[in-house]
């Protein structure tokens, strides 16, 4: 189950990275971050906004909301 969850997470982050979709990321402490994912790995997400980069650790992330519908899989219609 953990492997499938990691795969879905990777597919989502890679899709928004490739399509340069703006995200709003809410942290567990309530802080709201916005920007575009430029890179990610198993532990962190690199977010860019206004030419500045922020390295956000995944364990601190509560929710990620894309600014537009995301089509993650072939043949899937964006919602």
Swiss-Prot record:
Keywords: RNA-binding, Stress response. GO terms for molecular function: RNA binding. Residues 10-70 form the Sm domain. The keyword RNA-binding applies. InterPro entries: Hfq (IPR005001), LSM_dom_sf (IPR010920), Sm (IPR047575). GO terms for cellular component: cytosol. PROSITE patterns: SM (PS52002). Belongs to the Hfq family. Homohexamer. RNA chaperone that binds small regulatory RNA (sRNAs) and mRNAs to facilitate mRNA translational regulation in response to envelope stress, environmental stress and changes in metabolite concentrations. Also binds with high specificity to tRNAs. HAMAP family: Hfq. This is RNA-binding protein Hfq.
């Amino acid at each position: 189950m953990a492997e499938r969850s990691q795969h879905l997470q990777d597919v989502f982050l890679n899709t928004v990275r490739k399509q340069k979709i703006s995200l709003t990321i809410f942290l567990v402490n309530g802080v709201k971050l916005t920007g575009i994912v430029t890179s990610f790995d198993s532990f962190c997400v690199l977010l860019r906004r206004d030419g500045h980069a922020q390295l956000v650790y995944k364990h601190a992330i509560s929710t990620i909301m894309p600014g537009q519908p995301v089509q993650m899989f072939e043949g899937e219609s964006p919602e």
